[in-house]
A protein has these predicted regions:
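An interfacial alpha-helical scaffold signature
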Residues: 39-49, 59-82, 132
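Flexible, glycine/charged-enriched surface loops at secondary-structure junctions
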Residues: 48-61, 105-107, 112, 187-218
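Catalytic cores of large soluble enzymes that bind and process phosphate-bearing ligands
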Residues: 27-31, 35, 61, 65, ...
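Conserved short hydrophobic interaction patches
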Residues: 39-42, 46, 180-184, 197
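Conserved phosphate-binding loops in N-terminal lobes of ATP-dependent enzymes
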Residues: 19-52
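Short, ordered loop/turn segments at secondary-structure junctions
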Residues: 25-27, 113-114, 171, 212-213
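N-terminal basic/disordered segments at the start of proteins
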Residues: 1-28
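Conserved mixed alpha/beta catalytic, RNA-binding, or beta-rich assembly cores of soluble enzyme
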Residues: 71-82, 86-96, 100, 104-194, ...
């Protein structure tokens, strides 16, 4: 993804197996690193004691005394009908972004195809597709922060997505819904089913799916001029 027409300071932080790329107007390196490490450790500790949380492809129930980030992941993934494993990366991205948004008005956090974007202006995203073409979509101006999950296909199967972007109220939900889309695409009439699914998941704003020569759009996602 490429953010167009925006100037800001860019840096990256490494937390174990995660690399977060951050754009912000001010110096928030140390705050970003501390927040990312804190959220990662919460998830890592919980996952060690509850390995199903990191490996299940289906919704998992968690106890009421679990850390807030764990409960939020479980609830969000269940809303999309998938397992919490698909929202882990987006959760850290989300929570770091929300933490920084308390200090700065404009911030983007990117981790492996998951994006938290808070901006007072509309942003244009370049959504890539295999084998190299692209389309630009719009992320509306927002004060709370929105999530985007993007996937670039890499296989020859007819049911395998060539490119995918989901825009949602959170990065966690975008990642979970993107996983749901890819699962549905393997079924008969998969593209139609995937677009219907995106319209039905509460909190998903919209999505675009590239499947072979076909392009499908759902929800309120807007193509950029």
């Amino acid at each position: 993804m490429r953010l167009l027409k925006r100037k800001s300071r860019t840096f990256e932080i490494q937390v174990q197996d995660m690399t977060l790329h951050i754009q912000a107007a001010t110096d928030v390196d140390e705050e970003s690193r501390a927040a990312a490490l804190w959220f990662w450790e919460l998830l890592h500790t919980y996952s060690i004691r509850n390995p199903e949380f990191r490996s299940s492809k289906r919704p998992v129930k968690v106890p009421g005394d679990a850390p807030e980030i764990v409960r939020e992941i479980a609830s969000t993934a269940a809303r999309a009908g998938v397992g919490p494993m698909f929202s882990l990366q987006g959760a850290v991205t989300d929570h770091v972004g929300r933490f920084l948004a308390r200090e700065v008005n404009e911030v983007t956090v990117n981790c492996g195809g998951d994006y938290f974007i808070r901006s007072r202006r509309r942003q244009k995203l370049t959504v890539l597709r295999r084998p190299g073409s692209s389309v630009a979509v719009v992320v509306p101006a927002n004060r709370q922060g929105l999530g985007v999950s993007m996937t670039l296909g890499h296989g020859p199967k007819r049911s395998e997505v060539d490119g995918l972007a989901v825009l949602a109220e959170s990065c966690m939900l975008a990642g979970a819904a993107a996983a749901g889309v890819q699962a549905i695409l393997t079924k008969e009439n998969g593209l139609h089913g995937a677009l219907t699914y995106l319209k039905q998941v509460t909190g998903v704003i919209g999505g675009v799916v590239f499947l072979g020569e076909r392009i499908g759009m759902a929800g309120g996602l807007e193509l950029a001029a």
